[in-house]
């Protein structure tokens, strides 16, 4: 754990040079969540590391899964690096049509916390406020403090809807073309981006 650091810049450079690749970000947010994995031995190790509850079970004798509650803490250096990595990938990959907003729900964070990630992507000032709460020695291990990019609303719509739909071949989804599925979410404009995306005015399907 002492050598834990981000290599997102290297991954993003490779990604940007290879236009045939798509990826999801698997972002992490601080706070309580539950980890679920088919890697039973790792879940047992996580249980040992945290001292939290643990459950492992077989699924139809073909595979298994482990479940362990977990808290990502900004004061924890490893957790802080994990938090930075997902944001770095989203910000350093140039083409929003090929990188998708996810949290590996619920492992990294629950999907209903996406508005928090959206605010982190759209506001460099908010990112800086959050980074100020991290351990001082993290700055040599991550790239995030050097990134000034801020997402536009168009780019947010792309990584959340249009991009995934195109990558999956769901031609009826993710766009407003004639004859396409009219799945719409309308928001009341608000300078607080996290609040705006947390409280849609209308959801139309």
Residue ranges of each PLM-predicted region?
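Active-site core of metal-dependent hydrolases
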Residues: 1-90, 95-108, 126
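His/Asp/Glu-enriched, well-ordered alpha-helical/loop segment
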Residues: 63-67, 76, 83-187
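C-terminal cap of metal-dependent C-N hydrolases
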Residues: 181-205
């Amino acid at each position: 754990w002492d050598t834990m650091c981000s290599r997102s810049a290297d991954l993003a450079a490779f990604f940007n040079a290879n236009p045939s690749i798509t990826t999801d970000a698997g972002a992490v947010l601080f706070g309580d969540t539950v980890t679920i994995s088919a890697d039973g031995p790792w879940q047992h190790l996580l249980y040992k590391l945290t001292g939290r509850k643990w459950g492992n079970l077989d699924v139809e004798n073909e595979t298994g899964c482990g479940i362990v509650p977990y808290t990502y803490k900004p004061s924890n250096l490893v957790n802080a690096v994990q938090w930075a990595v997902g944001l770095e990938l989203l910000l350093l990959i140039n083409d929003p049509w090929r990188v998708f907003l996810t949290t590996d729900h619920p492992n990294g964070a629950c999907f209903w916390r996406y508005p928090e990630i959206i605010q982190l992507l759209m506001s460099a000032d908010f990112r800086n406020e959050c980074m100020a709460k991290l351990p001082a020695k993290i700055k040599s291990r991550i790239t995030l403090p050097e990134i000034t990019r801020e997402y536009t609303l168009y780019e947010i719509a792309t990584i959340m809807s249009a991009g995934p739909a195109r990558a999956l071949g769901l031609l009826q989804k993710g766009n407003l073309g004639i004859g396409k599925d009219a799945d719409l979410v309308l928001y009341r404009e608000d300078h607080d981006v996290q609040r705006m995306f947390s409280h849609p005015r209308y959801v139309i399907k």
